Amino acid sequence: PKFQTGLNNMESVVLNKMDKYTINVDGVIQHGGGYYMYTTTASKISQVDEKMASMFSEVSTYMDENGIEKSGNPFVLYNEWNENSGNVIFSAGIFTPSEVITPAASEILTGFLPNQKVLKTTLKGDYKNLKEAWDTAYNYIEANDLEIAEDTKNFEVHLTSPENVANPAKWITHLYIPVK
């Protein structure tokens, strides 16, 4: 019984450490933008986390198979977000140093993110805390009288992933909201 109690206590400590997270609003910066390869889907908001991993893999595999250089970390571009319906249209992409022309039938496309002023927020922790991180960023915008640039889209860059960092408390995601 004492051994089992000890194991249960140890498990509790480990799980608590894995649940730790921090959200930091880094401030307004200039994001350099650039070309990227991507694929897009529509889904329920609750499915973004599970879908993005396979989409990143699909884009990465396409780039590897076609000898296309990667520059930077995978990112998610939110094309449309509808809280009322619970639906989202998003793209999963990987930056590349130059424009790539893809065949007409390709599921993987090329896009360009402009150099733009953005509010940068950093989440260190599990993706389940992303909503709180986005809410924190929007609250900062409101509290500091910043104006959202409506003609561009929010995006998040994943510096780490579950594939290469097992502990969710160590995952790092940068959130970017374009501002004027």
Name each region found by the language model:
Residues 1-180:
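A solvent-exposed interaction/effector surface
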